[in-house]
């Protein structure tokens, strides 16, 4: 028996939520962060993107800025991208690919698989 069998490239993963998920929702499972590209009904199979480039909500006007190449983290409590891991409470999204100023409402991030 093989030690591993190839399943697929891994840009998306299977996901069956316990509650409805709306397209664009960020889903955190342990240290894995994915984005729903389509609506997923509760208890129905769907998928989450775990690779790709997305615009994530960020605090606007709170002094939060991002430079290209910065690490971005997801604050699942406040549903925004942040600059720190919050002592492990915030999960790594990936690297910033478009700078975001303090007044910007979003930051563009390449997900880290």
Can you annotate each of these PLM segments?
Residues 1-113:
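Surface-exposed, low-hydrophobicity beta-strand/loop segments enriched in small/polar/acidic residues
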